[in-house]
C-alpha cells in the first residue's frame, strides 16, 4: 500500500506528534486507505493491514490522520464502545478544507460510496458535501463558496 522503509518507529513517530490528532478505528485499513486516496486525494505515508498514516495537502491546507485496525486496540477501552455499533463516528464531522466537494462527490459516487449530502453553498461561507466512508465516518470536504 505504501512504502514505509523511511517511516519512523512507532515510538519516534508518537513522540513527534503535536497539536490535535485524529485516529480512526476501522474494520479494514486497506479499504479505508482506498477511500481516503480515491475520494479525498489523500496520500498514504505508511500503510499496512493494521495501521496507516494519511496526509492531505492542498493550497494552504494540510492534514494528517491515522487509521488503526480494530485488532490493534485489543487492550484499549475504545474497542469496547464499538462492539454493538454498525456506524462509527456518529455525531462527528471530519472536515477537510480546500478539498473540492463537487470533485470529491463525483469520486465517491464513482467508487460506490454513500453521499449523505450533495455539495451545497452554506451560510457559513463554505461549499461542502457530506460523504460516509466504509466505516460510517462522515467526511466533509469544503471550499470557500464563490461570490
Regions found by a protein language model. Give the residues of each.
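Vicinal oxygen chelate
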Residues: 2-23, 43-99, 103-132, 143-147
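Short, surface-exposed ligand-recognition loops at beta-strand->loop->(often short) alpha-helix junctions
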Residues: 24-28
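Generic non-transmembrane alpha-helix signal with a bias for helix starts/N-cap capping motifs
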Residues: 29-30, 101
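Conserved active-site tyrosine of GNAT-family acetyltransferases
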Residues: 32-37, 108, 133-136
